[in-house]
A protein has these predicted regions:
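Active-site hotspot residues in diverse enzymes, especially metal/ion-binding acidic/histidine motifs
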Residues: 1-335
């Protein structure tokens, strides 16, 4: 085979694939000895193709590798990515959904499409004081929709909040934006779930939110529907209104107010603070309030991926597939 493994890596970099992503998709069984085996070279290319969403045929010759899902994506928000980067991002996400689906224990039920967020909220409130990030994740996994936080990003520059992806009849929610407090991520996951429930994804497609949906106040109809779903799930209202006699002077005042209001409203305090930020376009006060609402900042990605580690049936994967998924999830264990 004319293309060496090192040249293959360089060709992948020319597509915009990050070195971190190439390391993650590279099979753990690869060795210097494999370099001299034609069958190993072919298997290397098929493995990388499956994980990045590349056409296997394009990897066997000397032409530039091409993505299978070039145009099967919707990008919401201001994009700094060119067509090649968009193809890489959507193909990576769709391929990851395919691999994840092997270990998702719950079978996706088509009746999820059109699910009423108020009905889901009512179900969750039977066992929780309000709808929290862990409740949304539990519901999503229970519906057969895995949720993970990407610790390996396919592109060198990460400009993505989250994406909903579909491979055949399998869906997944992939979060990209880091957070230190759970409320913003709860909204992101609920928003992507809204895209899925509202039928915004045809088979083998990705919907990528590049900008912060709440802060953008988009007029895009699909974004409006996903926002409405998320807000009704989290708060019970499509347009929650937070009333003050006068605007909170600082984050401490806002934090105290939403913590008092959370129990009677059955809305998580951080979510209430974010509702104020959305309503008043005052995100500085909102972020200051979040720092007071929660005991301490924490890496929310670890929380999401610990849930995923528990939920996935690891016996469904080969050792190499399991190594790949753990790399994508940041190597999180149950501890």
């Amino acid at each position: 085979m004319k293309r060496t493994a090192e040249r293959f890596r360089r060709d992948l970099r020319t597509l915009g694939i990050s070195g971190q992503a190439i390391d993650a998709v590279w099979p753990s069984w690869w060795s210097e000895e494999a370099e001299h085996s034609n069958s190993a070279q072919v298997e290397l290319r098929f493995t990388v193709a499956r994980r990045l969403g590349l056409s296997p045929k394009s990897l066997l010759g000397d032409e530039e590798p091409t993505f299978v899902w070039k145009h099967e994506a919707k990008f919401k928000g201001l994009s700094t990515y060119g067509s090649k980067e968009q193809a890489a991002l959507s193909s990576f996400g769709i391929s990851l959904a395919r691999i994840l689906s092997k270990g998702v224990r719950a079978t996706f039920d088509g009746r999820v499409i059109g699910l009423d967020p108020l009905r889901l909220r009512g179900t969750l409130l039977k066992t929780s004081p309000f709808v929290r990030l862990q409740d949304i994740c539990a519901a999503s996994w229970g519906l057969g929709i895995p949720v993970i936080h990407l610790r390996v990003f396919p592109l060198s520059a990460k400009h993505m909040v989250a994406m909903a992806v579909r491979h055949g009849d399998h869906f997944a929610i992939l979060v990209g934006k880091d957070a230190k407090y759970p409320a913003p991520t709860a909204y992101h996951v609920a928003h992507e779930l809204g895209h899925i429930v509202n039928g915004h994804l045809p088979p083998n497609a990705a919907l990528v939110d590049l900008s912060e949906p709440l802060e953008e106040k988009s007029l895009d109809s699909e974004e409006v529907e996903a926002d409405s779903f998320a807000l009704r799930l989290l708060t019970g209202q499509a347009s929650p209104q937070i009333e003050f006699n006068q605007a909170p002077a600082n984050g401490a005042v806002l934090a105290a107010a939403v913590m008092r209001a959370s129990a009677p409203s059955r809305i998580e305090p951080g979510t209430l603070a974010m509702c104020y930020g959305y309503q008043a376009s005052d995100w500085a006060t909102t972020h200051a309030a979040l720092a007071r609402i929660y005991e301490r900042p924490d890496d929310v990605w670890r929380f999401l991926n610990r849930i995923a580690t528990r939920e996935l049936d690891w016996e469904a994967y080969s050792d190499d597939e399991a190594d790949y998924l753990r790399a994508v999830m940041g190597g999180v264990e149950l501890a």
